[in-house]
Amino acid sequence: SFMAMTVVTVLWVLVAFGLCFGPSIGGIIGDPTKNFMFQGVTITSAWELAPTIPFLLFAFFQAKFAIITPALITGAFAERIRFWAYLLFMVLFILFIYAPLCHMTWHPDGLFFQWGVLDFAGGTVVHMSAGWAALAGAIFLGKRKVQKVNPARITYVLLGTGLLWFGWFGFNAGSAVGANGLAAQALATTTVAAAAAGMAWVFFDKILGHKVSAMGACIGAVVG
């Protein structure tokens, strides 16, 4: 999934950003020629729905959503497909699934946007598309040949949970595209939801007679 940072970033600069946020073509996809190679994406211009931040900053903020989406899918077929096939999958996924869905949902002239669909921080564009793609990949590949699963290293789990929890502040609060009340509400909701879910998971482990563990608290926090 680390390769998603390299492949998707380059693809984003080349054409994917234009496909997502360029002038709308039928409300389905953007015109890639408008912002090809980031033409017109400068620090002196701004996206129409984010007038308080530079266009270049907005473009790279959105790039992080595009990067994380195929990375989320990786777990469904990790170690079961060839490396080059995975790279090809990422390119095709971004161009033919992520870009149209992003444009229709987040572009003011997009089809879903015009219908009133609200996706504040990627519930549809990121998580739904990644979930369905992962499910399709898992069904196509079938069960793993090796069923043995090595125990997770709790140190890495704790570190990953902390990074993920903190990183979600950027995704959720940052989606307000400004230092404003909406960003504060998103940050507060993210914090309380993760904390409450982590605590609830620990309590339910205790009630059900399971061993209370840091692993359970981490799983609960991520679920929240």
Where are these regions (language model features)?
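Hydrophobic alpha-helical transmembrane bundles of multi-pass membrane proteins
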Residues: 1-224
